[in-house]
């Protein structure tokens, strides 16, 4: 009779007992660290885009904020903002509109979809307007219309050229007919500025569409555009469904507009300050 029993050389696992594994934390990559280029679809490290926000692979021109535009365009420290504090009265009492405005102000740091003021660009004093598509797609409401109108009126009195960077998804639907009347209102101010013999330069940026395109964006004495910018009135699908025809692949791109005479020149972002200053000087310069 054996005094000692032979031990098994393996361990027994109860199949009915659940084995819980500790969840492993997944590495998190901040959303703002990388961007996908809409042009070539490359994933790009944000720092590789540089301050100009240009794709290093295909030279696609990314959209930028009004603050970024100021930093790239004007002489440092020369911007003096005008017409701040104007607020929409929400004429239609559109549901959720005031909440939307408050959210956009907090998110963008802007009060409205356009920044207006005066600045020096390579030593030339200009009345400057910059529309920012980050604010409700830079849609044109009563405040946008009022600020741009006042900019032209101020420039007319002070005998300044106007430089306007346009970007917009069109009229602001939350303000109805009040937003549409801004087209005529701004155009009248543009005409008075022109009658005074003053220079108006527009730079079309991505996207410039709707009522903005149908009015002051295309009324400049000279019209420039950034590369590959979308510029048009109605959307591509709306037009195709209306005319029952397929449109060219590059339809409504800045290059297409240049080819058909709607734009005077396409200028790379890095070249815009020098180009703007040269055109202002060519048209008499600024009085200051």
Swiss-Prot record:
GO terms for biological process: fatty acid biosynthetic process; malonyl-CoA biosynthetic process. Gene3D superfamilies: 2-enoyl-CoA Hydratase, Chain A, domain 1. It is found in: Cytoplasm. Its cofactor is Zn(2+). GO terms for molecular function: acetyl-CoA carboxylase activity; ATP binding; carboxyl- or carbamoyltransferase activity; zinc ion binding. InterPro entries: AcCoA_carboxyl_beta (IPR034733), Acetyl_CoA_COase_Trfase_b_su (IPR000438), ClpP/crotonase-like_dom_sf (IPR029045), COA_CT_N (IPR011762). Pathway: Lipid metabolism; malonyl-CoA biosynthesis; malonyl-CoA from acetyl-CoA: step 1/1. Binds 1 zinc ion per subunit. Zn(2+) binds at residues 37, 40, 55, 58. Keywords: ATP-binding, Cytoplasm, Fatty acid biosynthesis, Fatty acid metabolism, Lipid biosynthesis, Lipid metabolism, Metal-binding, Nucleotide-binding, Transferase, Zinc, Zinc-finger. One of its GO terms (cellular component) is acetyl-CoA carboxylase complex. Acetyl-CoA carboxylase is a heterohexamer composed of biotin carboxyl carrier protein (AccB), biotin carboxylase (AccC) and two subunits each of ACCase subunit alpha (AccA) and ACCase subunit beta (AccD). Component of the acetyl coenzyme A carboxylase (ACC) complex. Biotin carboxylase (BC) catalyzes the carboxylation of biotin on its carrier protein (BCCP) and then the CO(2) group is transferred by the transcarboxylase to acetyl-CoA to form malonyl-CoA. Belongs to the AccD/PCCB family. This is Acetyl-coenzyme A carboxylase carboxyl transferase subunit beta.
């Amino acid at each position: 009779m054996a005094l000692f029993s032979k031990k098994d050389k393996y361990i027994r696992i109860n199949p009915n007992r659940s084995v819980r594994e500790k969840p492993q934390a997944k590495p998190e990559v901040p959303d703002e660290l990388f961007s996908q280029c809409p042009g070539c679809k490359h994933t790009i490290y944000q720092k590789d885009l540089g301050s100009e926000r240009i794709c290093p692979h295909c030279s696609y021109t990314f959209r930028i904020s009004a603050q970024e535009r100021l930093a790239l365009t004007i002489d440092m420290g020369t911007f003096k903002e005008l017409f701040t504090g104007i607020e929409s009265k929400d004429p239609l009492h559109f549901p959720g509109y005031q909440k939307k405005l408050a959210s956009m102000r907090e998110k963008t740091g802007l009060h409205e979809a356009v920044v207006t003021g005066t600045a020096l660009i390579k030593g030339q004093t200009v009345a400057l307007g910059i529309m920012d598509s980050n604010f409700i797609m830079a849609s044109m409401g009563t405040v946008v219309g009022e600020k741009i109108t006042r900019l032209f009126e101020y420039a007319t009195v002070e005998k300044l050229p106007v430089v306007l960077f346009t970007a917009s998804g069109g009229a602001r639907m939350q303000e109805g007919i009040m937003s549409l009347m801004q087209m005529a209102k701004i155009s009248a101010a543009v005409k008075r500025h022109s009658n005074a013999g003053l220079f108006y330069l527009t730079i079309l940026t991505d996207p410039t569409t709707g009522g903005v395109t149908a009015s002051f964006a295309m009324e400049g004495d000279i019209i420039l555009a950034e590369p590959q910018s979308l510029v048009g009135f109605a959307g591509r699908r709306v037009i195709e469904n209306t005319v029952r025809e397929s449109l060219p692949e590059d339809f409504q791109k800045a290059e297409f507009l240049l080819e058909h005479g709607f734009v005077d020149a396409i200028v790379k972002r890095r070249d815009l300050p020098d180009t703007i200053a040269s055109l202002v000087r060519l048209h008499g310069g600024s009085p200051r």
